[in-house]
């Protein structure tokens, strides 16, 4: 969910998407965290130098994570020092960090083997993983697709059920990789999928109550582009006006679509699209979830993002509105955060989306709660809080999976 508040393009036409297959080169780029009491000083630096931000503060003394290209480093250092801002280096060389992260391990047949969660993977291997997982558990799983992406890829997931039989229980829907560069969500959602059947006692207890629909990659075109051409790509790959590419799929859902938490600029990272629900990926997801709602109903929806370590409740479109069952949602979110912390000491902040991270209209969580009356819905921001940001080292995949699975189990214990 994390937005890029782009005040100027990082790589000219490459980041804006005007050259669809140009590979972005981030060697020599620094990612720097600034903080200070007067955030207007930071805004001035970002604006004057035309820099990209990974994260911008909601209040004074909050952190701002900024990407600085080589040719602007000297001026950035001069201006930040003159403004008296605190500085911390997140990535000394973003390109080197990306290269290390992209050491994809070859995939071996057989599902979640000992090496799967030790590295990130290409799109084709994720498809193989899901198919192998389903084959290994054919008696209570099936491959499902919600529809096709703009470029014609299937939006693939796995349906897992328990003793009641296929489709007999209320649905739980987990979405990963809505934003293409948030790779830790892909792996963590797959870790949850694996644990539903590997954690025999806890998994069986959940599957006897609910049918799970797990979609590790809901933005396949964007994800492929992020692995093959631009690691920092966020949106889908539709071509827009001005020759720019991509709609922000978490600003395109057809509920409270037209608001301050997105933009009409086709070149912006938070472009909401030309109309509510216009993106093929959004159409596919809304249609699929509506079908579940018309069946046994939707018990829970979680939209998994990174980064910032947050577990949030509705709403995103308004900072004053609250869901009808807000007290229950807050209790569940707190249970998630407490259980996560007990595993590796990772702290998550909880609260409504708008007041916790930023205003976001046209998002999936609000749509699920108000349009199809899903009982519970949450938006998560996984590891970390900014030391690595979107480029999270592979050695954090398993810890992220372990703590998130603990949080999921705890959250369900509060669900009646």
From Swiss-Prot:
Propeptide segment residues: 18-113
Residues that hold Zn(2+) according to the record: 179, 182, 305
Residue pairs linked by disulfide bridges in the UniProt entry: 244-267
UniProt xrefs under Pfam families: Peptidase_M14 (PF00246), Propep_M14 (PF02244)
Compartment(s) where it occurs, according to its Swiss-Prot or TrEMBL record: Secreted
Annotated binding of substrate, by residue: 179-182, 234, 250-251, 306-307
UniProt enzyme class: hydrolase
Keywords: Carboxypeptidase, Disulfide bond, Hydrolase, Metal-binding, Metalloprotease, Protease, Secreted, Signal, Virulence, Zinc, Zymogen
Stretches the record annotates as Disordered: 264-283
Enzyme Commission code(s) on record: 3.4.17.-
Cofactor comment text: Binds 1 zinc ion per subunit.
Function, in words: Extracellular metalloprotease that contributes to pathogenicity.
Name of this chain's protein: Metallocarboxypeptidase A-like protein MCYG_01475
Source organism of this protein record: Arthroderma otae (strain ATCC MYA-4605 / CBS 113480) (Microsporum canis)
Source lineage: Eukaryota, Fungi, Dikarya, Ascomycota, Pezizomycotina
């Amino acid at each position: 969910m994390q937005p890029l508040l782009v005040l100027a393009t990082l790589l000219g036409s490459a980041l804006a998407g005007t050259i669809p297959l140009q590979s972005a080169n981030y060697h020599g780029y620094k990612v720097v965290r600034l903080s200070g009491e007067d955030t207007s000083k930071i805004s001035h630096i970002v604006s004057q130098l035309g820099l990209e931000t990974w994260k911008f503060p909601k209040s004074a003394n909050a952190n701002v994570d900024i990407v600085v290209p080589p040719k602007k480093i000297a001026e950035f250092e001069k201006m930040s020092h003159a403004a008296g801002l605190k500085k911390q280096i997140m990535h000394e060389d973003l390109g080197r960090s990306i290269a290390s992260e992209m050491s994809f391990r070859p995939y071996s047949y057989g599902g979640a083997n000992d090496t799967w969660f030790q590295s990130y993977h290409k799109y084709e291997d994720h498809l193989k993983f899901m198919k192998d997982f389903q084959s290994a558990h054919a008696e209570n799983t099936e491959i499902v697709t919600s529809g096709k992406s703009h470029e014609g890829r299937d939006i693939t997931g796995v349906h897992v059920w328990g003793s009641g039989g296929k489709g007999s229980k209320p649905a739980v829907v987990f979405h990963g990789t809505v934003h293409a560069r948030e790779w830790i969500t892909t792996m963590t959602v797959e870790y949850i999928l694996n644990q539903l059947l590997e954690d025999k006692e806890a998994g069986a207890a959940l599957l006897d109550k609910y049918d799970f629909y797990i979609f590790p990659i809901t933005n396949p075109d964007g994800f492929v582009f992020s692995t093959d051409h631009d690691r920092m790509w966020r949106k889908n790959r539709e071509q827009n006006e001005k020759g720019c590419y991509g709609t922000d799929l978490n600003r395109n859902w057809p509920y409270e679509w037209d608001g301050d938490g997105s933009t009409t600029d086709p070149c912006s990272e938070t472009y909401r699209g030309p109309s509510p629900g216009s993106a093929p990926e959004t159409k596919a997801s809304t249609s699929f979830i509506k079908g579940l709602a018309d069946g046994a109903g939707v018990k829970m929806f979680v939209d998994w993002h990174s980064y910032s370590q947050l577990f949030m409740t509705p709403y995103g479109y308004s900072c004053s509105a609250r869901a009808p069952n807000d007290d229950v949602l807050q209790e569940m979110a707190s249970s998630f955060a407490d259980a996560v912390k007990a595993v590796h000491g990772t702290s998550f902040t909880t609260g409504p989306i708008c007041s916790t991270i930023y205003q976001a209209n046209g998002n999936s969580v609000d749509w699920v709660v108000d349009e199809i009356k899903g009982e519970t819905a949450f938006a998560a921001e996984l590891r970390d809080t900014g030391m690595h940001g979107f480029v999270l080292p592979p050695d954090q995949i398993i810890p992220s999976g372990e703590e998130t699975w603990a949080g999921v189990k705890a959250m369900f214990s509060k669900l009646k």
